[in-house]
Amino acid sequence: MKLYNTLTMTKEEFEPLEEGKVKMYVCGPTVYDFIHIGNARPLIVFDTLRRYFEYKGYEVIYIQNFTDVEDKMINRANKEGITVFELAERFIQEYYKDADRLNVRRATKSPRATEEIEDMIALIQRLIDKGYAYVVDGDVYFRTRKFAEYGKLSHKNIEDLMAGARVDPSEKKEDPLDFALWKAKKEGEPAWNSPWGEGRPGWHIECSVMAMKYLGQTIDIHAGGQDLIFPHHENEIAQSEAATGKPFARFWLHNGYVNINNEKMSKSLGNFFTVREIIEKYHPEALRLFMLQAHYRKPLNFSIDLIEQAEVALKRIYTCYENLEFLIQNAASSSENDDKLKAAIEELKAKFIDAMEDDLNTAEATGYLFEMVREINTHANSCSKETLTFAKDILKELCSILGILEQYSAKEEAIPQEILELVEKRNQARKAKNFLEADRIRDELKSLGYIVLDTPQGTKVERIK
C-alpha cells in the first residue's frame, strides 16, 4: 500500500516497523463542546485506514487522545461554573455517542492528557537536562533554533515560520518562536505540582508523551487534520526527537479542510454544523459516505444538498443488500447469468482494492462500489442462490472496509399481519387470473402505505418511505 507522507511530500510504500502490526496515533478532539463536521473528517478517514489495515490482516494499535486541559476548556468551564474535569467528562461521553453512531471503532487506548501529567513532567525535565528547554518564572519553553531540523514537516525554514506564524511574543522567551512546554499557574486554572512550581502542560507536549508512552519512541503513522501540521505536529517532532534522538513517526498523514458552501467553516459566519445536528436529521452513515466520496487530502465542500445526495446513494446500497436477502430465499440452484455477475463483481472488487492501496483513494473505491450495486441490480433477478450469496457477501465485505452497511437489520420493521393477509389475497387473485381484484388490493395496500413488487422469486412488500 502506498501512502502520501507529508514529511517527504511523496507517496511511499508502507511497511510497518514490526511485521504484522501497525502503530497509529491520531490527534483527538479538545473536549469542550460537541464535535463538528470538521472534527468528523479525520475520525472517519483514519478509522477507514485502520479498518483497511485490519482487513489486510494487520493488528492495529490505534491511539487517539483527548485533550482535556486547554485554554478553550478552561474558559468554558469557568463560564459554566464547573471544573475542567466535569466539562471533559461530559463531552467525552457526547463524543462517544457521535463517534459510535458514525461507526468509528473505539481506539485501542484513548488517553486523557490530565492522566499523563507525571510522564509529561519527566519528558520536559529530560529536555531541560539536554539543553533543549529552559525555565523562566515557572514557565518552561523549548529552544526551537537548537533543533536543527525544525520546519522539516511544514517544509519551511525558521525565517519563513517566523514571518507567517501566530507566535506568542512573550518577553520571557529567548526567541519568539520558542513554544511552551509548561505554563505556570494562573488564577482560575487547574494546576499540578512540578519541579518548576505549580502549572499545567502545553498542548504539544501532551501528544508526544501519549504517543511514545503507548506506541514507543518511533511509531508507524501519526495522523490528523492539515491544520495541525504547523505548529502542533512540527513541535511534536522537535520535542520528541530532541529527547530521544530517534525519528518520531515514519509516516505523517493529514486530511484536508472541510468548507461549508465553499466557505471556511466558522461559528462567526454562522455556517457551523455539529455532527449531532447532522446525524439527528440524516442517516449517520450518509455523513460517513459523504466524507469518503472525496479523496482525504483534498478540501471537502459540505452542504445540506450534498449530504442529502449521499443519503440517497446510501439508500441504494441498503436497498441492493435487502433485495439480495429477499431473492436468496427463493432463487434457483443455477443460472446461465451466474458467471457474468460473478466476473463483474470480482473485477470491481479488485479495482476497489487497488484504489484503497493507492493512498486510501476512497473516492475511486466508492465509485467502484456503486458500479457493483448497478451490476447486482441488473442481473440479480436471474441469478442462482450461490451467486446471490456471493454478491451479498462481497458487498458486505467492501462496505465494512468503508464503515457503512453496519446499521442494517432485515427485520427492522415487521410488516403487520393484516397487510400480509391482503398480500396473500392478492396473490390468490393473480393465480385465479382475477387481475381486477388483484389491482384493487394493490391500490388498497398503497392507500395503507405499502407497495407490492412482483418478482420471479415471489411477491415483495415494502412500506412506502
Swiss-Prot record:
**Pfam families, per database record:** CysS_C, DALR_2, tRNA-synt_1e
GO annotation, cellular component aspect: cytosol
Q: Do you know which Gene3D superfamilies this protein is assigned to?
A: Cysteine-tRNA ligase, C-terminal anti-codon recognition domain (1.20.120.1910), HUPs (3.40.50.620)
The molecular function terms in GO held by this entry are: ATP binding; cysteine-tRNA ligase activity; zinc ion binding
- Give the residue interval(s) assigned to the motif 'KMSKS' region: 264-268
Motif 'HIGH' region, which positions? 29-39
Cofactor dependency: Zn(2+)
**In which family does this protein belong, per the annotation?**
Belongs to the class-I aminoacyl-tRNA synthetase family.
Subunit field text = Monomer.
State what protein this is by name: Cysteine--tRNA ligase
Its organism's taxonomic lineage begins at: Bacteria, Bacillati, Bacillota, Bacillota incertae sedis, Caldicellulosiruptorales
